[in-house]
C-alpha cells in the first residue's frame, strides 16, 4: 500500500517593453511525500483450494514467518528563475534551486543547485539578411549543477535487526545491522552543453548538433566490507 502527494505553488511575472526586451521572472515552491508499507504472509493447510483467506490456514509454512517493510520519503524545494530575450536575437536564463530530502544525513539534507544558459540567433542579425536560403542559425550554451536521490529511505539512519527465534524472559533481542551516516550528502552532476541549430531551404533541411559533458561528484555506490568490520556493506 502506498500514498503520495506532490504540491506546487508557482508565481510568475512577464513583461515586454520597448518592443525589443522580454523578461520573465518565476518562483516555484514544491513539497512532496511518498509513504508505503507492505506485509507478506506465507501460510499453508487450507481446508479447500477455493478457500484462500489467511485466517483459514492451518499454519505458517516451514521456516516461514510474517515479514513487512515500510518507507517514508519527504522532499521540499524552492526555485527561482529569470529569462531575458533581447530583440529575439540574444537569450539568457538563470535558475537557482534549494532542495531538501529526508533520505540524506541530518547535516546534509539541503543543497543548492543552479543553471545558466545563453543563446544567439545569428540569422536575425543584419549581416545575415541577404542569406535567403538560411532560415535558422542558432548557437547556444549552458551549464548546470543537478542532484539525484538513488538509494533507500533509511540509508543514512542506524538500522537494527530483531532476533525472533530466541527470546530472553519473553523479550526480543536485536543487533545493529547498519551504521548511521549523518554526512550522507547529495550526488551532484556538473553538466556542460554547447549546441548548434541550423534550418535551411524553408526548413526542409534541419540540423541539430550538441557537444556535452557530464561529471558526477560524491558518487554513491554499494561496497562489500570485510566481515571483521561487523557490517557486510
What are these regions (language model features)?
Residues 1-233:
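Extracellular/periplasmic, surface-exposed regions of secreted and cell-surface proteins
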Amino acid at each position: 500500500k502506498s500514498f503520495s502527494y506532490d504540491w506546487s505553488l508557482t508565481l510568475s511575472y512577464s513583461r515586454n517593453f520597448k518592443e525589443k526586451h522580454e523578461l520573465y521572472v518565476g518562483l516555484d515552491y514544491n513539497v512532496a511525500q511518498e509513504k508505503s508499507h507492505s506485509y507478506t504472509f506465507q501460510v499453508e493447510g487450507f481446508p479447500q483450494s477455493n478457500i484462500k483467506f489467511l485466517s483459514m490456514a492451518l499454519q505458517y509454512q516451514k521456516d516461514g514467518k510474517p515479514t513487512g517493510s515500510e518507507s517514508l520519503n519527504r522532499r521540499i524545494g524552492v526555485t527561482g528563475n529569470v529569462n531575458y530575450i533581447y530583440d529575439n536575437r540574444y537569450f539568457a536564463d538563470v535558475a537557482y534551486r534549494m532542495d531538501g530530502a529526508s533520505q540524506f544525513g541530518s547535516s546534509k539534507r539541503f543543497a543548492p543547485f543552479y543553471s545558466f544558459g545563453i543563446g544567439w540567433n545569428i540569422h536575425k542579425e543584419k549581416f545575415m539578411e541577404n542569406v535567403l536560403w538560411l532560415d535558422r542559425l542558432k548557437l547556444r550554451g549552458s551549464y548546470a549543477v543537478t542532484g539525484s536521490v538513488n538509494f533507500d529511505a533509511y540509508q543514512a539512519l542506524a538500522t537494527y535487526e530483531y532476533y525472533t527465534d530466541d527470546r530472553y524472559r519473553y523479550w526480543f533481542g536485536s543487533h545493529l545491522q547498519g551504521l548511521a551516516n549523518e554526512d550522507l550528502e547529495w550526488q551532484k552532476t556538473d553538466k556542460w552543453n554547447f549546441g548548434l541549430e541550423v534550418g535551411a531551404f524553408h526548413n526542409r533541411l534541419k540540423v541539430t548538433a550538441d557537444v556535452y559533458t557530464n561529471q558526477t561528484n560524491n558518487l554513491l555506490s554499494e561496497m562489500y566490507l570485510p566481515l571483521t568490520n561487523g557490517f557486510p556493506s
